[in-house]
Amino acid sequence: MTPPPATGKPSSSLLDRVSSPADIRDFSIEELEQLTYEVRQEMIQSVSFTGGHLGAGLGVAELTVALHHIFDTPRDRLIWDVGHQAYPHKILTGRRGRMRTMRQGGGLSGFTRRSESEYDPFGAGHSSTSISAALGMAVARDLKGATNNVIAVIGDGAMSAGQAYEAMNNAGAAGSRLIVILNDNDMSIAPPVGALSAHLSRLLSSPSYHSLRHLVKDLAHLLPPSLERAVGRAEEYARGMVSGGGTLFEELGFYYVGPIDGHNFEHLLPVLKNLRDSDDTKPVMLHVVTKKGRGYPPAEAAADKYHGVGRFDVLTGQLEKPKANAPSYTSVFAKALIAEAEVDDRVVAITAAMPGGTGLDKFGDRFPARTFDVGIAEQHAVTFAGGLATEGFKPFCAIYSSFLQRAYDQVQHDVVLQKLPVRFAIDRAGLVGADGATHAGSYDMAFLGCLPDIVIMCPSDEADLMHAVATAVSIDDRPSAFRYPRGEGVGIELSERGSVMPIGKGRVVREGNRVAILSLGTRLAEALKAADELAARGLAPTVVDARFMKPLDEELILRLAREHEVLITVEEGSVGGFGSHVLHLLASKGALDNGLKVRPLALPDVFVEHDAPAIQYEKIGLNASGIVATVLATLGEARSVVSA
């Protein structure tokens, strides 16, 4: 069925009848096709209003409908890897009425979330976790003597991460029934699919084939060893002829079925039904081929298939692009790195499947031979960068803060312990807005700051970011890192190339008295606003841009402690970061013994919910008014007042 173009308000005659997946279990194929069309229209309309991940969900609309039609969710556990593609799933599982709140303050998450619905048995946001979680659920089911199915849906991109293969290796040996659906939406694995492949996949997944296969194997045991091996080789050869491409999965212990057309219900439904009803204990890999952005021509025509988009016009697909007041930090990083690479051919760049998100697509356009996209493989990316560093290159490993967490052992063991001069460009530092807690860059200062002999820079604006890049290039005797947030800078004038900063030295932005505000990172603008407000009240604080989280500018910090009554530290990181290191310094030097009042302002010890970044920071007191309130409370009370 070819859906009409996505224009106007979607007709929802069938979707209006669906409040849960149970309502679609008796639908005919024709009704399922119509329902899929309506789900796509609902999704397009919702994402045009909220922004979000559109292309992946459009690509799995038929698969989502088919899964909820065949399987008894939520009793049967359905786990979506990453969660980018789960919007149709949300629409069908009782959340349709809240789709326009998605990624908004107080609204639905942009990913699956256990606290949001019983149909989300496992939360996500990062990739390649679904098979591990599904196997855990399958083993738990067996231990409890239950009979429900467990299904994991994972994309071909997520299959580039090692955890997926670790999980498959374990699953192949565990002996628990598990269904893994490989959603191949880039044609990167599968050959063209068609009726023959669908017919053979239906055959391979059928109970009769399974029974015949077991019978042949049982009879083969009665034959002499040489003939038994020949029968096994013949069976493997025959399966390879009909399945085409499943050898790796078979070697890992999976029963491979596919590839089949993920947009054709006549192909999907019988195979899924066979897998649902199978009593085989071997895990199964079902390979489906889909088209990202399916059903919305602007998405199908776009290079990124509308993977992640802001608000857009439904009729034209034109994205709303508010006029930027300044370039984004990501684009400034790319500009700075290109400028350094122009004069130093040892500068190379590494990304873990995020060239566009990190700005390395621009670097790659200019220096393709010096740009390495290693896939969703942060652990490998870090150690690969370490290897480059041993040979005299200057690797910049550009990874989102929340994704760098996945490679912590490699950072510590492979890079920092060996003092290899890898440069970590940590994008999306601090709170990130609509993507919420799964993507927030809250912890990098805490988990990097405890490592010996690493330089950690936190630029306060886009010009400082260019200086951080230049400084990182100059550091050849140890690893370094610099962190910067999502979004645009403050609009400061930029030079063509950054300048090298003195290591571990901050700068006094404004001299004052009584109160010192020691800011690290891009909260400096809010610190200066707070200083203006306090000055209007007759109190002129000193404002300092720390610049370095490690090493600290001990001389400057101790001077601030001697000359002020109150010291406020401000950072876009969790407890255990900059403020904690400053307090440790002050305590160890006896600087707290004479009554100095220190108040660390950091991210609170909770996961901050998704919302607009400005609102997120306002709620936790990390804006100008929060700083002012903390200063006034501290001056007005003898006892400790800590803002959270």
Curated annotation (Swiss-Prot):
<dbReference type="InterPro" id="IPR033248">
    <property type="entry name" value="Transketolase_C"/>
</dbReference>
<dbReference type="InterPro" id="IPR005477">
    <property type="entry name" value="Dxylulose-5-P_synthase"/>
</dbReference>
<comment type="subunit">
    <text>Homodimer.</text>
</comment>
<protein>
    <recommendedName>
        <fullName>1-deoxy-D-xylulose-5-phosphate synthase</fullName>
        <ecNumber>2.2.1.7</ecNumber>
    </recommendedName>
</protein>
<dbReference type="InterPro" id="IPR005475">
    <property type="entry name" value="Transketolase-like_Pyr-bd"/>
</dbReference>
<dbReference type="GO" id="GO:0009228">
    <property type="term" value="P:thiamine biosynthetic process"/>
</dbReference>
<keyword id="KW-0784">Thiamine biosynthesis</keyword>
<dbReference type="GO" id="GO:0019682">
    <property type="term" value="P:glyceraldehyde-3-phosphate metabolic process"/>
</dbReference>
<dbReference type="InterPro" id="IPR049557">
    <property type="entry name" value="Transketolase_CS"/>
</dbReference>
<feature type="binding site">
    <location>
        <position position="84"/>
    </location>
    <ligand>
        <name>thiamine diphosphate</name>
    </ligand>
</feature>
<comment type="pathway">
    <text>Metabolic intermediate biosynthesis; 1-deoxy-D-xylulose 5-phosphate biosynthesis; 1-deoxy-D-xylulose 5-phosphate from D-glyceraldehyde 3-phosphate and pyruvate: step 1/1.</text>
</comment>
<keyword id="KW-0808">Transferase</keyword>
<dbReference type="Pfam" id="PF02779">
    <property type="entry name" value="Transket_pyr"/>
</dbReference>
<dbReference type="GO" id="GO:0030976">
    <property type="term" value="F:thiamine pyrophosphate binding"/>
</dbReference>
<feature type="binding site">
    <location>
        <position position="185"/>
    </location>
    <ligand>
        <name>Mg(2+)</name>
    </ligand>
</feature>
<feature type="binding site">
    <location>
        <position position="378"/>
    </location>
    <ligand>
        <name>thiamine diphosphate</name>
    </ligand>
</feature>
<keyword id="KW-0460">Magnesium</keyword>
<keyword id="KW-0479">Metal-binding</keyword>
<dbReference type="GO" id="GO:0052865">
    <property type="term" value="P:1-deoxy-D-xylulose 5-phosphate biosynthetic process"/>
</dbReference>
<dbReference type="GO" id="GO:0000287">
    <property type="term" value="F:magnesium ion binding"/>
</dbReference>
<dbReference type="GO" id="GO:0008661">
    <property type="term" value="F:1-deoxy-D-xylulose-5-phosphate synthase activity"/>
</dbReference>
<comment type="similarity">
    <text>Belongs to the transketolase family. DXPS subfamily.</text>
</comment>
<dbReference type="InterPro" id="IPR020826">
    <property type="entry name" value="Transketolase_BS"/>
</dbReference>
<feature type="binding site">
    <location>
        <begin position="125"/>
        <end position="127"/>
    </location>
    <ligand>
        <name>thiamine diphosphate</name>
    </ligand>
</feature>
<dbReference type="Pfam" id="PF13292">
    <property type="entry name" value="DXP_synthase_N"/>
</dbReference>
<feature type="binding site">
    <location>
        <position position="185"/>
    </location>
    <ligand>
        <name>thiamine diphosphate</name>
    </ligand>
</feature>
<dbReference type="GO" id="GO:0016114">
    <property type="term" value="P:terpenoid biosynthetic process"/>
</dbReference>
<dbReference type="InterPro" id="IPR029061">
    <property type="entry name" value="THDP-binding"/>
</dbReference>
<keyword id="KW-0786">Thiamine pyrophosphate</keyword>
<feature type="binding site">
    <location>
        <position position="296"/>
    </location>
    <ligand>
        <name>thiamine diphosphate</name>
    </ligand>
</feature>
<comment type="function">
    <text>Catalyzes the acyloin condensation reaction between C atoms 2 and 3 of pyruvate and glyceraldehyde 3-phosphate to yield 1-deoxy-D-xylulose-5-phosphate (DXP).</text>
</comment>
<dbReference type="InterPro" id="IPR009014">
    <property type="entry name" value="Transketo_C/PFOR_II"/>
</dbReference>
<dbReference type="Pfam" id="PF02780">
    <property type="entry name" value="Transketolase_C"/>
</dbReference>
<feature type="binding site">
    <location>
        <position position="156"/>
    </location>
    <ligand>
        <name>Mg(2+)</name>
    </ligand>
</feature>
<feature type="binding site">
    <location>
        <begin position="157"/>
        <end position="158"/>
    </location>
    <ligand>
        <name>thiamine diphosphate</name>
    </ligand>
</feature>
<keyword id="KW-0414">Isoprene biosynthesis</keyword>
